[in-house]
A protein has these predicted regions:
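Beta-propeller and closely related beta-sheet repeat lectin domains
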Residues: 6, 69-72
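Beta-rich carbohydrate-recognition and catalytic domains
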Residues: 13-16, 21-63, 77-82, 87-140
Length: 140
């Protein structure tokens, strides 16, 4: 058995995943949903698709994160780790003002079926470890 890294390419061999943002991004209810379909199904048939019953990534008031959405997946330099990049707000005030959203990144994990586990949006002040395979610099 050769060790292998899990990536989004592995996911697409078995099923297609479409992450989408829902609700208005000026509301605390802006969130991410998920559509899935078997990769061998008739993708033009609406019955081939399953929609998550609940958002798969949503506000986390305990971490002062409101309206997370518009995520994309980013691999570490050596593709052994994966991250999501998204934007959100840290306060409920001024929700209807379009500025005030900040860009965030956090590491994700994978379940036994190769589906990304997005986790809970972290506090804006959460520190991350350097991604796996990050080159070191000779500069001081």
């Amino acid at each position: 058995d050769q060790p292998r890294s899990r990536g989004l390419g592995d996911v697409y061999k078995r099923q297609l995943l479409i992450y989408y943002s829902a609700s208005g991004n000026w509301t605390p209810y802006y969130c991410v949903g998920l559509l899935t379909a078997d990769a061998n199904s008739d993708l033009l048939n609406p019955n081939s698709w399953k929609k998550s019953l609940e958002p798969v990534f949503k506000q986390a008031p305990e971490n002062h994160v409101y309206g997370p959405g518009s995520l994309c997946f980013i691999p570490s330099p050596d593709k052994k780790e994966w991250y999501i990049l998204y934007h959100a707000r840290n306060a409920l005030r001024d929700m209807f003002v379009l500025d005030g959203r900040t860009t965030r990144i956090q590491k994700i994990e994978w379940d036994e079926n190769g589906i990304p586990i997005l986790g809970i949006p972290q506090k804006e002040s959460t520190l991350l470890q350097k991604p796996s395979g990050t080159p070191t610099s000779d500069r001081n």
